[in-house]
Amino acid sequence: MLCPALLCAALLLLTPVEITDARALQQPSDAAQFMEQFLESYNDLLTLDDLENMLNSHPEDQSNLSSSKADEYPKWAEADTPWLRLLRGALANQKRAEPDRSRRGWNRGCFGLKLDRIGSMSGLGC
């Protein structure tokens, strides 16, 4: 019983250990520069306020807003596509869900909620 354990320990001690170095694919300054360029390219996107204004505005106001955006940002000339409709739908669903959540009492408790195994909700404290 002791012999196999000693044999394993001896084999582990005798195995050569290679030291390996880890290197990044790019220099950190290149990565920071890439991230900065990436963020600058998305500066022209609509903000949440613009999206809310589009959702709440009348159709004639919306055409004025989209034409002004197209003048200001040429990238937005063809932007009224499924992506914009998807974002509008998500914003509308989020606004619709907020009162419903508070009515059910989902936000009670100090530590949040727990979904039990059978699917019932229970508070985690206070």
Curated annotation (Swiss-Prot):
Gene Ontology MF terms: hormone activity
Keyword tags: Cleavage on pair of basic residues, Disulfide bond, Hormone, Secreted, Signal, Vasoactive
Localization per Swiss-Prot or TrEMBL: Secreted
Presence of keyword Secreted: yes
Alphabetical list of PANTHER family matching this protein: C-TYPE NATRIURETIC PEPTIDE, NATRIURETIC PEPTIDE C-LIKE PROTEIN
Function: Exhibits natriuretic and vasodepressant activity. Has cGMP-stimulating activity. May help to regulate body fluid homeostasis in a variety of aquatic environments.
Protein name: C-type natriuretic peptide 1
Organism: Takifugu rubripes
Highest classification ranks of the organism: Eukaryota, Metazoa, Chordata, Craniata, Vertebrata
